[in-house]
């Protein structure tokens, strides 16, 4: 391994950025695979970073134990990239990009680690996540030839039909065209890591009537000493990975506890343990994609100044495709708003920009026909819906910052249409506030998060 920390920028390396596939892109492709009953295969590149070509002249000392006799004063000139170099991941990504394009694959312009090969009725998708390759397609013969060709270019490990992707278990019922994503094994490890495997099981990931704030930070030296022994940041990080992959149901709760990582108090830690207890009860929940209409639908919502520290609102959104959630978000707004309408208008603007990316990403595939059809974005506030369509100068909207009016341009060019929906049917509601159990679980059903018995 090279001592990359001794490299000098501008001399030994220049750019170091290397993209990886986004989790939402993987979920979208899995939803498409479930709808069309595509094959899902997996491969792994052995020692991937040794395949990159170097543009710079890099020298390194001879490795200990392999020093050439009578040439102890000599150094090695690298012909290829190796682990430890600052540019190693970038060199590998560039090499793979060149190789896969030479075999007829086209790169998705809006997701550089997703490739497509479409010829006649044969459809192939390839996803690259560092050294993990996901191959999705409808022709076993062509897919086999791709695997043979990749093996001729790199040292590959054929993992066959995909069962685990980045720690996510894939469960398929091909007869009913259903695909489930489960992190039960990961959740078990998290519970054991934080000694919660024998705790009581929680009904919800949040506690009603117990808002979090900066006032709950440690106030006495005893509390400070106690919290120093608590693995708060590690627990939040572990929860966040589950939330980002397959568990939109804990998105709001994880977002709330993550705001206090710099100096958490006992009540903040109790909130984290409450989420762990909920995951203990729902460890077998899956994110399910079914053979439903392959039309993306968006939902947006916001609360009003629920943040007790800065009086800012929380925006929430979720997009579904094929009966399951493909992307979701719960974030604190960057501005202070003056009304509920303004809060929901700001939230809708951010979601509309996500819809633009989603439409471009899907249009590039050529199998989801949405080029001429706008994505429907549901909002439960009539004022925000009206404000998004036409300029309205009234006392509740005249203070809205100009940059949020981009949603009108997005609507005008036909990328998005904003429609009114009842709050009870708004799937984005759980991303902005704590809900009663029955309402919360009905929204989970709409997002495809459920317990499946003997179906997958």
Q: Each predicted region: which residue ranges?
A:
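Structured nucleic-acid-interacting core domains from mobile-element enzymes and related host factors
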Residues: 32-37, 277-302, 370-371
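Metal/cofactor- and membrane transport-associated sequence elements
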Residues: 1-155
């Amino acid at each position: 391994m090279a001592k990359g920390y001794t490299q000098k920028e501008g001399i030994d390396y220049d750019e170091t950025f290397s993209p990886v596939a986004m989790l939402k892109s993987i979920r979208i492709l899995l939803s498409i695979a479930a709808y069309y009953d595509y094959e899902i295969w997996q491969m792994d590149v052995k020692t991937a970073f040794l395949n990159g070509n170097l543009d710079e002249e890099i020298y390194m000392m001879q490795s200990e134990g392999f020093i050439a006799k009578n040439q102890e004063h000599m150094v090695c000139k690298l012909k290829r990239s190796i682990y430890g170099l600052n540019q190693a991941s970038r060199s590998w990504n560039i090499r793979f990009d060149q190789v896969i394009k030479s075999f007829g694959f086209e790169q998705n312009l809006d997701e550089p680690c997703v490739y497509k090969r479409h010829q006649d009725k044969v459809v192939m998708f390839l996803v690259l996540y560092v050294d993990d390759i996901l191959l999705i397609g409808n022709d076993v013969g062509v897919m086999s030839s791709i695997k043979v060709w990749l093996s001729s270019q790199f040292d590959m490990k054929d993992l066959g039909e995909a069962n685990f992707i980045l720690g996510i278990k894939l469960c398929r019922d091909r007869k009913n065209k259903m695909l489930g994503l489960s992190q039960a094994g990961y959740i078990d490890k998290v519970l054991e890591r934080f000694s919660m495997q024998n705790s009581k099981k929680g009904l919800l990931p949040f506690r009603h009537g117990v808002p979090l704030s900066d006032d709950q930070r440690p106030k006495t030296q005893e509390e400070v000493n106690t919290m120093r022994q608590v693995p708060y940041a590690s627990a939040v990080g572990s929860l966040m990975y589950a939330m980002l992959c397959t568990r939109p149901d804990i998105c709001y709760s994880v977002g709330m506890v993550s705001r206090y990582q710099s100096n958490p108090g006992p009540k903040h830690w109790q909130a984290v343990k409450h989420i762990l207890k909920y995951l203990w009860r729902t460890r077998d929940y899956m994110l399910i994609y079914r053979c439903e209409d392959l039309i993306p639908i968006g939902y947006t919502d916001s609360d009003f100044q629920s943040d007790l520290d800065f009086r800012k609102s929380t925006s929430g959104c979720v997009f579904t495709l094929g009966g399951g959630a493909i992307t979701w978000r719960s974030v604190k707004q960057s501005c202070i708003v003056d009304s509920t309408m303004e809060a929901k208008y700001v939230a809708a603007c951010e979601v509309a920009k996500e819809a633009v990316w989603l439409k471009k990403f899907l249009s590039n595939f050529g199998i989801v026909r949405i080029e001429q059809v706008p994505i429907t974005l549901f909002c439960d506030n009539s004022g925000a819906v009206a404000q998004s369509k036409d300029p309205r100068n009234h006392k509740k909207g005249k203070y809205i910052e100009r940059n949020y009016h981009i949603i009108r341009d997005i609507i005008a060019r036909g990328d998005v249409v904003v429609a009114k929906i009842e709050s009870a049917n708004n799937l984005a509601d759980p991303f902005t506030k704590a809900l009663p159990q029955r309402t919360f679980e009905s929204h989970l059903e709409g997002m495809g998060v459920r317990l499946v018995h003997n179906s997958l």
